[in-house]
């Protein structure tokens, strides 16, 4: 990183949220504690470390904080792509508070949270209109995005295929009812992809999430106007693809926005902090509040407003089944989170190192 004072107009071109120095007290306090450090943004995350940048053209391999190398250090407290950090030379000295994020419960038996991307304005949930089209997976992504501070936009790629058009129309109607934007595009066609421009203005940051083979890397290349990201063909029998993107990376776009491409994620576990109403099920939650019994399971109870809506053809029964499944998963994850918090508090009281716990980030 440069030893000159921060160039805030240039930092704005990679997503810096203010025209000058930070305007939030928490950021100001960290700046004051590190007067010799300069701000930079994490633009790549690898298993072996990070790459950070303070301009769209220049980046350096960054030395992470020593505590981030400890196996039991909470994963959510390590930097993620999109994070803002303070650096002295090539060394990260502080992680600045996140303004928004998208995260998931990490794979495995033990409770951890994984930050997928930080300080983002928009989450593009990418799904192909092919054999991999899965409305239930879209709902799961919407749940993870909800409450994180970023706006979800569902992007259906391979719009030139018509086999799943009827299913897509049903999803469109459900999303429109909740004011969640949906755009169908041909990821290889610049004119078609132009439909995403409203969310890719100067200084904005968006992240692409979705399964392998959904077209995220193809979409990235079209937005860039060049073949920067490697793409692979998908299997014809199930439309699944290999992991083209192997690590998360933030890429400046010609529009002045920044785009974060991510590898396909096979497992999308809730963290226990999700709000079903904010995560794509506001209509179901509103109906559930009208049920006769507060603990209604929406199966066969008398006075169930959710079942009545299903019987009237106003709700998709498969969507309600997914809602109930996700509600159980969120409750289970919330119990694990509470246990971790309790262990953390006991560890602090005893003077022992507390158990790792991923606490909610600042939004």
From Swiss-Prot:
Chain's gene name: rsgA
EC code: 3.6.1.-
Cofactor note text: Binds 1 zinc ion per subunit.
Lineage summary: Bacteria, Pseudomonadati, Pseudomonadota, Gammaproteobacteria, Lysobacterales
Keyword Metal-binding among record annotations: yes
Pfam families xref list: RsgA_GTPase
Main subcellular localisation: cytoplasm
Binding site for Zn(2+): 291, 296, 298, 304
GO MF entries: GTP binding; GTPase activity; metal ion binding; rRNA binding
Annotated Gene3D superfamilies: P-loop containing nucleotide triphosphate hydrolases, Probable gtpase engc, domain 3
Any one of the GO CC terms: cytoplasm
UniProt KW keywords: Cytoplasm, GTP-binding, Hydrolase, Metal-binding, Nucleotide-binding, Ribosome biogenesis, RNA-binding, rRNA-binding, Zinc
Annotated GTP binding sites: 157-160, 210-218
Protein name: Small ribosomal subunit biogenesis GTPase RsgA
Subunit structure: Monomer. Associates with 30S ribosomal subunit, binds 16S rRNA.
Subcellular location: Cytoplasm
């Amino acid at each position: 990183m440069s030893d000159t004072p921060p160039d805030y107009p240039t930092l704005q071109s990679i997503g810096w949220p203010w025209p000058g120095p930070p305007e939030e007290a928490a950021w100001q306090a960290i700046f004051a504690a590190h007067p010799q450090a300069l701000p930079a943004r994490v633009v790549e995350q690898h298993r072996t470390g990070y790459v950070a940048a303070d301009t769209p053209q220049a980046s350096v391999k960054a030395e992470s904080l020593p505590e981030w190398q400890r196996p039991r250090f909470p994963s959510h407290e390590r930097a993620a792509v999109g994070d803002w950090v303070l650096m002295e030379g090539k060394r990260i000295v502080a992680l600045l508070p996140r303004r928004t994020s998208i995260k998931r419960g990490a794979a495995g038996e033990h409770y951890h949270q994984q930050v997928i991307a930080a300080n983002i304005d928009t989450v593009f949930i990418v799904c192909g209109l092919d054999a991999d089209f899965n409305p239930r997976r879209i709902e799961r992504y919407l749940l993870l995005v909800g409450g994180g501070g970023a706006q979800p936009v569902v992007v259906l790629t391979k719009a030139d295929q018509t086999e799943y058009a009827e299913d897509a129309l049903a999803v469109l109607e459900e999303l429109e009812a909740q004011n969640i934007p949906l755009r169908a595009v041909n990821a290889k066609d610049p004119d078609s992809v132009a439909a995403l421009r409203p969310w890719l203005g100067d200084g904005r940051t968006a992240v692409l999430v979705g399964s392998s083979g959904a077209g995220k890397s193809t979409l990235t290349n079209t937005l860039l106007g060049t073949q920067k990201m490697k793409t692979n063909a998908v299997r014809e029998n199930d439309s699944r693809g290999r992991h083209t993107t192997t690590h998360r990376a933030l890429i400046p776009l010609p529009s002045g926005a920044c785009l974060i491409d991510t590898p396909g994620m096979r497992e999308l576990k809730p963290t226990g902090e999700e709000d079903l109403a904010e995560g794509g099920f506001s209509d179901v939650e509103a109906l559930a509040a009208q049920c006769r019994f507060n603990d209604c399971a929406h199966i066969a109870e008398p006075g169930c407003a959710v079942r009545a809506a299903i019987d009237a053809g106003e709700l998709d029964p498969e969507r309600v089944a997914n809602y109930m499944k996700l509600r159980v998963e969120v409750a289970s994850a919330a119990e694990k989170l509470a246990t971790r918090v309790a262990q953390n508090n006991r560890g602090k009281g005893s003077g022992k190192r507390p158990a790792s716990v991923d606490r909610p980030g600042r939004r």
